[in-house]
Regions:
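A structural microfeature
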Residues: 49, 144, 149-152, 214-215, ...
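A conserved beta-turn-beta hairpin within the catalytic core of GNAT-like acetyltransferases
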Residues: 57-71, 81, 223-236, 246, ...
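A short, internal acetyl-CoA/4′-phosphopantetheine-binding micro-motif in the GNAT/acyltransferase core
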Residues: 71-83, 109-113, 238-247
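Short amphipathic alpha-helix that is part of the acyltransferase structural core
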Residues: 1-26, 38-40, 146-153, 160-195, ...
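Conserved active-site alpha-helix within GNAT-family acetyltransferase domains
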Residues: 99, 112-147, 252, 276-294
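Conserved hydrophobic beta-strand within the GNAT/NAT acetyltransferase core sheet
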Residues: 105-107, 236, 270-274
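Conserved acetyl-CoA-binding loop-helix of GNAT-fold acetyltransferases
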Residues: 81-98, 241, 247-264, 282-287
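Conserved beta-strand in the GNAT
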Residues: 38-40, 46-56, 70, 204, ...
């Protein structure tokens, strides 16, 4: 697998290098890894490609959802037989998932959950098929995967970052404060499996009036992928604010203050991903100076 990965055409959402130890951390050590879902293509003992089929986690993040299969990765060595190998691997993966009871197959992730390769593919999340992943796009099109939505990838350089300052935000600041927690407790089994070894930060929104938590946002270090970009970066995830508090404009305060704190810790870039249909989050990020960097595609194939 390391040799296959080394020969891939480069694009920003694919880690430039991997090693046996990195694959152990991001793939083989997961408690739900099944060797039968890792399918290799060889010719005269030479690796031509691999596909990894697995399952999404359920909405609670506490167990696998075997009815929802995921093609986590499909990587093929460029060359004369690349298309033939890619098609053969995809068919083998689909057959494996169907025999295991899957009713649907997603590529990359059932957003925002991806059981493997976080830190090697995508960014702050695995957005399905990453932009510029021509290999994945071609094989999914051939096998009849249907697009189900777009995931917008936002990025914000923290050079010279300034949070929003206006009358409304000054009022919010008087009513709320931010608590920063390094290496916070893991919020789900799924988070423990995919991010448990990474550096993480959580920022909580505290109501000064009663000391209650009204929201939070988390970040992780996106390694080893961020190392390929040559910048110290963190990925935003799990932004949650009480509906009543959100109407007060506190989401802007929470995210802005958390980003300001990270900038003070020499973080150079923040990435966030959200569904293109999530207009409130898209608007919030753009208000804070995040720019639309790329688009991922969610795709699904029905097996029934």
């Amino acid at each position: 697998m390391v040799e296959i990965w080394r020969q891939q055409q480069r694009f920003p959402s694919l880690a430039s290098t991997v090693s046996v130890s990195i694959l152990e951390d991001t793939v083989f050590s997961k408690p739900y890894f099944e060797a039968a879902g890792m399918i290799l293509a060889l010719k005269d003992d030479q690796p031509l490609g691999f596909v990894h089929a697995a399952y999404a986690t359920d909405d609670t993040g506490t167990d696998l959802e075997k009815s929802a299969g995921v093609i986590c990765q499909l990587r093929v060595v460029p060359g004369e037989f690349a298309e033939e190998v890619s098609n053969g691997l995809m068919q083998a993966a689909i057959d494996y998932l169907k025999s295991s009871g899957s009713k649907t197959v997603h590529f990359g992730s059932k957003f925002p959950c991806s059981p493997f390769y976080l830190g090697l593919y995508g960014g702050s999340r695995v957005p399905g098929i990453a932009e510029k992943d021509e290999q994945a796009s071609a094989v999914c099109k051939k096998f009849g995967f249907n697009d189900t939505g777009e995931i917008v990838v936002f990025r914000r350089s923290l050079v010279g970052f300034r949070t929003v300052v206006d009358r409304r935000q000054m009022k919010v600041r008087r009513a709320y404060q931010i608590r920063a927690d390094a290496d916070p407790s893991l919020q789900s089994w799924s988070e423990a499996c995919t991010m448990g070894k990474n550096l993480r930060m959580r920022f909580s929104l505290i109501d000064r009036r009663n000391d209650s938590v009204r929201g939070s946002v988390s970040y992780w270090d996106m390694e080893p992928l961020a190392n390929s970009w040559g910048v110290t970066a963190m990925g935003m995830y799990n932004l949650n604010v009480d509906d009543a508090a959100r109407r007060e404009g506190v989401a802007t305060f929470l995210v802005g203050e958390s980003v300001r704190h990270l900038a003070s810790q020499s973080i150079g870039l923040i990435e966030a991903q959200t569904a293109a249909t999530n207009e409130p989050t898209c608007g919030l990020l753009e208000k804070l100076g995040f720019e639309r960097y790329a688009v991922g595609r969610q795709t699904v194939l029905s097996l029934v």
